[in-house]
Amino acid sequence: MVAPVAELRGVEMRWGARPVLAGVDLVLQPGERLVVVGPSGSGKSTILRLLAGLQLPTGGSLSIHGIPQTYLRLDQRHPPDVRLVFQNPALLGSLSVRENVGFLLYRCSRLADAEIRQRVDQALEAVGLSVNIGEQLPGELSGGMQKRVSFARALINDPSIPSSQLPLLLFDEPTAGLDPIACTRIEDLIVRTTQMAQGSSVVVSHVHSTIERTAERVVLLYDGLFRWAGSLADYHQSENPYVVQFRSGSLRGPMQPGEH
């Protein structure tokens, strides 16, 4: 039996006396595309930071590929293949586009420069960018192009991680603040990138088009707990009061504005 890509059991997270997650259970299967939704401040991005190994839960257990995660990613000798795409592209401004996309290969592999260049070019083309921008600096690109460069970077395999391990791709509010056309381009890239990497993905978003275009399964987080989980089709039809309120954007319902 194949182990889940990620498994959270009774996960808690506190900031001082304030609970952010209050006993969250979640299982992510290989190849699955999950979208975590909920109002601002509900703890969605905290889930991503835990999965990425940037923080450890203050309670409960977290496993990636069946291995308990008890150390931060930077403290692990053999960390799992988890790739985080930030809302801000988070590119290194002093490095070229090619060096940003191939950063892991330049730093950790023994591949020849020509091989690295070929892999970077393939990643750039996969996200609809010309290989001719490889020598440009990120600051010379538009915001949309920078975001696509960050997606290309997510397609690069970490040479220190076994190729048999399926990657987990994490996307933090990838379409926040974008116009509808730009949203569509990024949403298509999320699906394509996940498929090309042959991995699973977790998207945090409150943008309805992103839910529609990227989700196979949806979970709704509010006040530190998952209040609903189901397929995208079930999300459309659910009469769960949290889902109904989130879909409609109504002020009436169990989720109260100004609480988070």
Predicted regions and their residues:
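Helical segment within the ABC ATPase nucleotide-binding domain
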Residues: 184-196
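Catalytic Walker B motif of ABC-type/P-loop ATPase nucleotide-binding domains
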Residues: 164, 169-172
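A short, surface-exposed alpha-helical micro-motif characterized by mixed small hydrophobic
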Residues: 211-213
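Conserved ABC ATPase signature
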Residues: 137-141, 145
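H-loop/switch region of ABC-family ATPase nucleotide-binding domains
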Residues: 205-206
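ABC ATPase NBD coupling module
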Residues: 69-83, 107, 235-238
